[in-house]
Amino acid sequence: MIKLDFEKMGGLIPAVIQDHESGEVLMVAFMDEKTLNLTLETGKTWFFSRTRNKYWMKGEESGNTQEVKEVLTDCDADTVVIKVKQNGPAACHTGNRSCFYVKWENGEWVEHSNPLFDPNEVYKK
Amino acid sequence: MIKLDFEKMGGLIPAVIQDHESGEVLMVAFMDEKTLNLTLETGKTWFFSRTRNKYWMKGEESGNTQEVKEVLTDCDADTVVIKVKQNGPAACHTGNRSCFYVKWENGEWVEHSNPLFDPNEVYKK
């Protein structure tokens, strides 16, 4: 029976969140065993924030939740790819559709930011 | 100027390798600053193996190298997505096209292995 390996990263695994239709990688965050189980049980994506040291559900503040369509793990069971339907206009807290809007071009990182919502409106301080 | 944050994971960042045409996530591995620079300079994917504690180029043994087409980082610059042309039949050392051939189905992980080469042939002991 396959069991996920959380040990390699001290209890966490990377979770690659992919748009189930376009294949675009929307974000990469981290899960522990509890948040992976919450994701599998609720059908919404839950993560462990390394910086805020807390559990969080994607969209708990913004409403931009993610509906789980498919969950895959890899050959050494230490990473997951989760295909989701992204609710709302964007996945990234900056308002960008995907968090991966910075591209390596001619020897430097170039931002291609195109926010689809105003973070100041969505994330009230 | 954007600089990648290797500190969060003690010198490493996750690298999500995606087929540049199909969008399929082929594998997730880890890079340090040196292997990211090698990847950007050589146009082939280089990683740091946490288990073997060494640098490796994808395909150095199998010949299944990966040609870098596009490199993206995210809003907090601590992860990269690299779109590649996969040379040879498969990315995974098991012979599967993608390492993500295990799917969560009805409460358990189910293997959907379909090797496109024989690892015993390709990886001589």
UniProtKB/Swiss-Prot annotation, chains A, B:
One of its GO terms (biological process) is L-histidine biosynthetic process. This is Phosphoribosyl-AMP cyclohydrolase. Pathway: Amino-acid biosynthesis; L-histidine biosynthesis; L-histidine from 5-phospho-alpha-D-ribose 1-diphosphate: step 3/9. Pfam families: PRA-CH. Its EC number is 3.5.4.19. Binds 1 Mg(2+) ion per subunit. Belongs to the PRA-CH family. The keyword Disulfide bond does not apply. One of its GO terms (cellular component) is cytoplasm. Disulfide bonds: none annotated. Zn(2+) binds at residues 75, 92, 99. It comes from Geotalea uraniireducens (strain Rf4) (Geobacter uraniireducens). Mg(2+) binds at residues 74, 76, 78. Its cofactor is Mg(2+); Zn(2+). It is found in: Cytoplasm. Homodimer. InterPro entries: PRA-CH, PRib_AMP_CycHydrolase_dom, PRib_AMP_CycHydrolase_sf. Keywords: Amino-acid biosynthesis, Cytoplasm, Histidine biosynthesis, Hydrolase, Magnesium, Metal-binding, Zinc. Signal peptide: none annotated. One of its GO terms (molecular function) is magnesium ion binding. Catalyzes the hydrolysis of the adenine ring of phosphoribosyl-AMP. It catalyses: 1-(5-phospho-beta-D-ribosyl)-5'-AMP + H2O = 1-(5-phospho-beta-D-ribosyl)-5-[(5-phospho-beta-D-ribosylamino)methylideneamino]imidazole-4-carboxamide.
